[in-house]
Amino acid sequence: MAGLQLAPHLPVGVMFPHNKTEAPGLHSAKHDPYEQSDSSQRPSMGHLRNSFQSKLWSNTEMEQEDEVSTRPKRNVCTKARRHSCPHSAGIRQQGSGNNAQGQGKGLFYLSSPTPRYPKANDQDFIPFRRKRVGVDRAYPLKPMVHRKSHSTSDAGADGDQNGYPRLPDSSEFSDNSFGLRSWVNSSLLASVQAEKVVAELHRTEWTQIQRLEAAGESLQKEIRRKEILLQEKLKKTEEGLRRMQKEKKQAIFQEDRELQRMVLPRRRVRDGDHDTPHKPCLSPEFRSEVFSRNRGEDQTCDQAQENPSPRQLSDYELQKLKRERLMASNSKIRDQDAGPSADAFFQPAEELGSTLQESSRSGTPGSSGSSSSTEEPELAKCSHCGRSFLSLRLQRHSTVCGKMQGSKRKVFDSSRARAKGTELEQYLNWRGPATAKAETPPPPRKSTWRQKHESFIRTLRHARQVQQVIARGGNPSDLPSILPADNPDYVQCPHCSRHFAPKVAERHIPKCKTIKNRPPPPRRHDS
């Protein structure tokens, strides 16, 4: 009796069913002994049913408020309650079995208009038996059952033995709902944290992508900037090269023009020094034509550089003739004594003027058709040097070239020039023939390096043998004498029959001669 506790007093003697549809099937008129009781107790049963329904509805409203807040929470709560409250399948089987055996246990279930929870076990309901008239309606003591140990099979056994299944307590609903709320909150927090982590990962990836794109754009800008700089440098170098080429062409053209201007006045001065027949070297027509051409050179400089014309060729021939004439005049001044007469060097003015006029007319713009048909001047080779010259210039060149080929230049001796006017000059004049003989190179000698090498090896071997004999304590004179070296370069002295090197022999032979030819010393007479 210590483990028992009093059950709450109910004013009604009949237990209400959970579902009205199941109540007729659970008990029949045959097995229920209290079926013929009076109908005065029915209003009390309705009152009990309404009070219990209101209690259940208060619990369900509290849970509905939580379900409205989060939709997934409702599904989780329903699943948890289904696991916590066993189904009513075992109850139905047990009720039908009890009715078949005739035990008279009337199990009724509370019916609700919209049932939201699964049917409870037999232990969650209180069976009620109608009491007879005049008997106390106090309920017997209800046995204590642990919440975690009850199951469907235990509930069926307890229902058969005691017949007092307990009602569902409101604390169980509150405890289950609190655990479910905490579990749902933890799951929601975990999902929210996972979403935050995923969002942060996406954010970091996006920032990295943006940084890479920015770096790529900066690299492209840098590459474009460097390309622009290289193009500018290339343009500058091209412009510099073009400017240098243009300046070079202009410098060459200016040099040619200055040469023409220098040659003409010299020619006039040189013609003035000669006799009157040679004075008119150039005709007045040719002079006027040359001066007019020099004036128009500045205007036609660019056109001549881009489009070479036959006139340039004629100018080049004219410049070549003038250079040769200038060189010939310089050589004539050097060789005034041995040179031929002026009539042999210079042709008459009429012939030279006619040749120059023909060459200049071939280069005029009006005679473009005739310049193509003009014949090239004949060239002849020199018999001395083999070079080719114009037939007009070949005679003069041959005379000068023959003189240069036949003459031999004297080698300048700076030592004699420094010694001139001093006492050293007499010594050099006295020593002149000997030095001339010494200056003649000696004939080449045949190489005898192999014979020298073999003689050197023989000498080393003989020296090694002598060292070995001395180490043993013997006499080195017992060894055979070494053969003399056959060196053809050495010179034998005629007085002592020894061989010496050439330079050493030159010093030794006179001394040995005096020593050998010296008379013997006088004998000493002993007293």
From Swiss-Prot:
Zinc finger intervals, C2HC/C3H-type: 378-407, 489-518
Any coiled-coil regions, as ranges: 207-254
Keyword Iron assigned: no
Annotated stretches, region: Disordered: 18-105, 145-170, 264-316, 352-379, 507-527
InterPro entries for this protein: Znf_C2HC_C3H, ZNF_C2HC_dom_1C
Gene3D superfamilies given in the database record: Classic Zinc Finger (3.30.160.60)
Transmembrane regions: none
Listed Basic and acidic residues bias regions: 286-298
PANTHER family linked to this entry: ZINC FINGER C2HC DOMAIN-CONTAINING PROTEIN 1C (PTHR14649:SF1)
Name of the molecule in the record: Zinc finger C2HC domain-containing protein 1C
